[in-house]
Structures are given as C-alpha cells and as structure tokens.
C-alpha cells in the first residue's frame, strides 16, 4: 500500500520545451567543434568578439528587421517586462550588433568595424528537423566600408568556415537585391505584376508593404503564380551591376564556387546589393545552413551614421545535421589525461591534493568518487578515456608511492608520491 502511495505521489518530471534542443554528451562535443571552428575562422580574419544581450527593445527588431517579415510579424518571442517595457528575445544578430556599434561609438574609430558573435537566437517556428525555436548561430559583421572586395572576403570566409569542418556537399547561391536608387522602379514593376494575380488577402497585404516578401513565399501555389515575376537582377542600375560583377569576379579569383540565383530573397528586409545563402540538399526542406548579405541603409535606419555593412549568420544546428548527412564526424570524444582511483578514506584525502596539483599544472584530471572499490573505479577510468590512471591504496600509502597505469601501453609504474606530478608532466607536457 505504501509503495503504491509513493508511486502516485512521485513528482512530475520535465522535458525541454518543444523545439528547443539539448546538446548533451557526446553530441555536445560536435556542437562545440562546429561553433568553435566558425569562431576561430572569424578571428583569423581579424574579427573581434562582441557579446550581445539575449533580449532587446522590441522596436529595434521591428524597425531593423522589417515589420513585413515573418520574423517580426509571426515568429518573435515578445513580452512586457515588470516595467511594462516591450522586449524581445533576439531573433537574429545584425540589428543588435548595429545597436551596439552606435551606442558605443565603435563607428568613430578605424573602419571597417569587424565584429563576430555566437549564441542562441529565438523564433517561434513550427519545429521540425533543422528548424528550432532556439537556434544556435555564429555571425560576423563588417561595418563602415562600401567595397565589393569586403563582400567577397565575407563570403569566402563563410565558405572556408564550412570547409574547415570537412563539409563538402554544399553550394553557395548568390544574387543582388539592388539599392535605394534602383529598387523603387523594380518594386513598382513587381507590385504591378503581383496585383494582377489572384492573391489571398494576407499575401496581397504583404505585396503592398514589401513585394519581395511574396517571392520568398514557400507555398507551391504562390511559387507557381510568381514563376514569371520580374527579377531584381534584371533591373540593377549601372553601379549595382558593377558592384555585383566585381564581387563575382573576386570570388572567381579566390576559387570560391557559386551559382547565381536571381529568385533568392532573404527573410530580412534590410538587405541591399549582395545577398547570399549556403545550401545543403542533405537537409531536405530546411536546406539553408547559413547566409547573409549587405545592408547599406540599416545603421541610418537605427539612428546612426549612414554607413554600409555586410555580414552573415552560420547555423550551428543545421551545420551539425549537414555533417551527419555526409557522414563527417567532428568533435573529439571527451578525454582526460589522468584519472585518480583512491582506495580508502586516507587515500582519497591524499589523492585529492595530487589531483588539484595536476590540474593547477595544466593536466586535465578526474577522480573516482564514492566507495566503488577497485573494479568499479577502473570502469570509470576506462569510460574517461584517460591516458594514465593513478591508483592509491593502503599499501601504496605505507610505501609513500602511487601506482601509475599507462592505459595505452598497459604498463604500470610505481612512483614516489612527491614525484608523481613531475613524472606525469614529463609524460604529458
């Protein structure tokens, strides 16, 4: 009876919210490998890290990302804080970076300002493979120089970031979205085309606010209706066309392969001129693994100088899926250099001091806890993949020695307690 009662009173456990993935070991090793590879490539290219708030004033994204986008109109996590201020969990990184550049006057120094960031972003989407409500990204932004060579550098950096992981079966899609000089005429032509179609009310409203958004509609019936829509790439003015041709020429010179996709429309309103996306067909419908573009009017739109900028965001989650699709393994299995096995209370006290000294010396060290006995503790040593295992029992304490087991060579050395740190340093450092 008491057993049944205890079962009924058992507290309910919890699961992660829908669409929010955990990366527990061993998968966390792959997560760190992908994220760190992206960050390291950015640092090698002269980008400095910036740490951004997880939430911002809602107006920043409404004005910066664009109210006609699905991101702002449907996907943002927005709430009122205790001071009744409207704040939003960041759905993307560029607007926050631009806000920080303006706020801290980073644009008053040497240009371009080159910044990189990494972390979680939040969008209320329908969860499926590769589409999460908390997504992990690494991004870069280069602000203050209107130079197509910078566009090419950014694109090549993203390409190199993927290849540094061993990813191969992806493609770079590229286009130009024009600028404030040539886009208005194209916008009118596109609206004239769209308003002649039997669009539903929501799509028609989108065409009124930003007709490019309609070309980004993934519904088959809308894609079929817009198959013959006029394209921005055919309506570039001379300056934008020269800019785009310079970018593609530089990519050719750098050996970065690409395909031109004149129908590409990124999901954010601030893009101008160069726009690009990296696609991996092994992911099915959610094939985009990263992308970016130029945003020449964004800083002024957010209250700063009228400076140009270009950047990208690389999806860590989707890149992990792409690597899995190609059968590429990244992330070394967790391993410590040394694993300590104490046998008895006195041994545990002595070994704790040795473990602490080894860690201070830069040697990664773990230790067996609980009274598991030699057999159980050695199983822990095997699971740790340690290179060396230290066994300290009563006999070793009496002899003032410790057994050092070489787990690869299957050899054992009896070493004086006061010499074991130096002995292991000689083997490992």
Swiss-Prot record:
GO cellular component: cytoplasm
Gene Ontology molecular function, alphabetical: ATP binding; histidine-tRNA ligase activity
Enzyme class, UniProt record, top EC level: ligase
Compartments, record wording: Cytoplasm
EC number: 6.1.1.21
Annotated Pfam families: HGTP_anticodon, tRNA-synt_His
CDD domains, sorted: HisRS-like_core (cd00773), HisRS_anticodon (cd00859)
GO biological process, one term: histidyl-tRNA aminoacylation
InterPro entries: aa-tRNA-synth_II, aa-tRNA-synth_II/BPL/LPL, Anticodon-bd, Anticodon-bd_dom_sf, His-tRNA-ligase, HisRS-like_core, HisRS/HisZ, HisRS_anticodon
Presence of the UniProt keyword Protein biosynthesis in the record: yes
Alphabetically ordered keywords of this record: Aminoacyl-tRNA synthetase, ATP-binding, Cytoplasm, Ligase, Nucleotide-binding, Protein biosynthesis
SUPFAM superfamilies named in the record: Class II aaRS ABD-related, Class II aaRS and biotin synthetases
Predominant location category: cytoplasm
PROSITE patterns membership: AA_TRNA_LIGASE_II
Reaction(s) catalysed by this chain's protein: tRNA(His) + L-histidine + ATP = L-histidyl-tRNA(His) + AMP + diphosphate + H(+)
UniProt entry tagged with the keyword Translocase: no
Self-association and partners: Homodimer.
UniProt similarity note: Belongs to the class-II aminoacyl-tRNA synthetase family.
Protein name (Swiss-Prot/TrEMBL): Histidine--tRNA ligase
Organism field: Corynebacterium glutamicum (strain ATCC 13032 / DSM 20300 / JCM 1318 / BCRC 11384 / CCUG 27702 / LMG 3730 / NBRC 12168 / NCIMB 10025 / NRRL B-2784 / 534)
């Amino acid at each position: 009876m008491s057993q049944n009662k205890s079962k009924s009173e058992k507290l309910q456990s919890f699961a992660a919210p829908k669409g929010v993935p955990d990366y527990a070991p061993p998968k966390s090793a792959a997560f760190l490998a992908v994220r760190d590879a992206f960050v390291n490539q950015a640092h090698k290219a002269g980008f400095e890290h910036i740490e951004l708030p997880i939430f911002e004033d809602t107006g920043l994204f409404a004005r910066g990302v664009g109210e006609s986008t699905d991101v702002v109109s449907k996907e943002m996590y927005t709430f009122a804080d205790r001071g009744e201020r409207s704040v939003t969990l960041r759905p993307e990184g560029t607007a926050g970076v631009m806000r920080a550049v303006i706020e801290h006057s980073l644009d008053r120094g040497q240009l371009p300002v080159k910044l990189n960031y990494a972390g979680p972003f939040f969008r209320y989407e329908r969860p499926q493979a590769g589409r999460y409500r908390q997504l992990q990204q690494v991004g870069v932004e280069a602000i203050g120089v209107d130079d197509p060579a910078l566009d090419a550098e950014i694109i090549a950096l993203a390409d190199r970031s993927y290849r540094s992981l061993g990813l191969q079966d992806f493609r770079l899609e590229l286009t130009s979205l024009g600028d404030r000089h040539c886009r208005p005429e194209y916008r009118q032509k596109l609206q004239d085309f769209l308003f002649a179609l039997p669009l539903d009310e929501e799509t028609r409203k989108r065409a009124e606010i930003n007709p490019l958004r309609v070309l980004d509609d993934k519904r088959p019936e809308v894609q079929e209706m817009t198959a013959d829509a006029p394209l921005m790439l055919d309506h570039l003015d001379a300056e934008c066309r020269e800019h785009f041709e310079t970018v593609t020429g530089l990519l050719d010179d750098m050996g970065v392969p690409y395909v031109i996709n004149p129908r590409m429309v990124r999901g954010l309103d601030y893009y101008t001129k160069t726009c690009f996306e990296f696609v991996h067909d092994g992911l099915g419908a959610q094939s985009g693994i990263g992308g970016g573009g130029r945003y020449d009017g964004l800083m002024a739109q957010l209250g700063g100088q009228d400076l140009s900028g270009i950047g990208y965001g690389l999806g860590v989650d989707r890149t992990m899926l792409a690597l899995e699709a190609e059968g590429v393994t990244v992330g070394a299995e967790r391993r410590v250099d040394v694993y300590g096995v104490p046998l008895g209370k006195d041994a545990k006290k002595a070994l704790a001091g040795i473990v602490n000294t080894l860690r201070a010396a830069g040697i990664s060290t773990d230790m067996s806890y609980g009274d598991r006995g030699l057999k159980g503790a050695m199983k822990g040593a095997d699971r740790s993949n340690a290179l060396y295992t230290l066994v300290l029992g009563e006999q070793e304490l009496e002899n003032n020695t410790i057994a050092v087991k070489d787990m690869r060579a299957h050899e054992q050395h009896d070493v004086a307690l006061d010499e074991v740190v130096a002995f292991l340093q000689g083997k490992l450092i």
